[in-house]
UniProtKB/Swiss-Prot annotation:
UniProt-annotated binding residues for Mg(2+): D11, D13, D178, D182
Coiled-coil boundaries: none
Keywords in alphabetical order: Carbohydrate metabolism, Hydrolase, Magnesium, Metal-binding
Protein name listed in UniProt: Phosphoglycolate phosphatase
Cofactor: Mg(2+)
Domain of life: Archaea
Length: 227
C-alpha cells in the first residue's frame, strides 16, 4: 500500500458483510493490513465492533450506536452522548400500545445499548415515530432495524470525536458505508464511497458508488489504495 493511504472509517452490516450479514472473509486481510487508522462505525452496540477489532487484531477505535458511543483505545477515552432514558421510555410506551420490540425475551439487540433503542423492522413504524418525536428523538431505518436515537448524535459526530482524540481531520478519511446512518460521516470524510447495495440516501451523499455489493463492494472501494 502507498504511504498516502488515508485513515479508514467503515460500517459493518451491509458493507463488510454479505447479504446474510455474515462477515465477508475477504475483507479481513484488508482491514488487518491497512497501514493507517481504521475506525469501525456501526449502529450496533459497542460490544460488537469492539469484538470485531479484538479478533482482527485492530486497535479498538469504534463509533457505536450511530455515534452515541465512541471508544478510542489509544487515549483510553469512552464518550456517551444521547438521551438513553428517553429512548427506553419510548420503548415502554410502544409496548403499552400492544407492540413489541421484536427481538425476543432476551433481546440481544438492545441488551448492551447505552444511548438508543432498536426495534425490529417487522414492527409498526408510525406509532414508533410518533412516540419518538414526542420525546425529541428520531427513528432511523437502517435497513436492519429501526433505531430510536437522539438527533444530536450520528456517525459524523462520532468521527469528529475520534478525530479530536487522535489529532486527525475528518477530511483525511476514506469512508465506506451503505445506509442513511452513514450519511453524516460521508459528508465529513475526504472521500465517501457507497457500496452498490446502499440505500438512496447513502448513494446520493457518496462521492463514489461501487459496481459490486456488500463485502465485494468494500473491496472495490478500497482497491485504488491497494494497487
Amino acid at each position: 500500500m502507498d504511504s498516502d493511504t488515508p485513515p479508514l472509517i467503515v460500517d459493518i452490516d451491509g458493507t463488510l458483510t454479505d447479504e446474510s450479514r455474515a462477515l465477508d472473509p475477504h475483507v479481513i486481510p484488508v482491514l488487518r493490513e491497512w497501514p493507517a487508522r481504521v475506525v469501525i462505525a456501526t449502529g450496533k452496540a459497542m460490544p460488537f465492533p469492539i469484538a470485531l477489532c479484538e479478533f482482527l487484531g485492530l486497535d479498538r477505535t469504534v463509533v457505536a450506536e450511530n455515534g452515541g458511543v465512541v471508544f478510542v483505545e489509544a487515549t483510553d477515552e469512552l464518550r456517551l452522548e444521547g438521551d438513553h432514558e428517553a429512548a427506553l421510555a419510548v420503548g415502554e410506551s410502544y409496548r403499552d400500545l400492544g407492540h413489541d420490540l421484536g427481538f425476543g425475551q432476551i433481546d440481544l439487540a438492545n441488551r448492551w445499548r447505552e444511548t438508543e433503542l432498536v426495534v425490529s423492522l417487522d414492527q409498526p413504524l408510525e406509532p414508533l415515530e410518533e412516540l419518538a418525536a414526542a420525546r425529541g428523538l428520531v427513528v432511523l431505518d437502517t435497513g436492519f432495524a429501526y433505531h430510536v436515537t437522539d438527533p444530536v448524535v450520528d456517525k459524523g459526530t462520532g468521527l469528529e470525536a475520534v478525530c479530536s482524540e487522535l489529532d486527525l481531520d475528518p477530511a483525511e478519511f476514506l469512508a465506506v458505508g451503505d445506509s442513511v446512518n452513514d450519511a453524516q460521516m460521508f459528508d465529513l470524510a475526504g472521500e465517501a464511497v457507497a457500496v452498490a447495495n446502499a440505500d438512496e440516501t447513502a448513494l446520493e451523499r457518496a462521492d463514489r458508488v461501487t459496481d459490486a455489493s456488500y463485502g465485494d463492494g468494500f473491496l472495490e472501494a478500497v482497491a485504488p489504495y491497494r494497487d
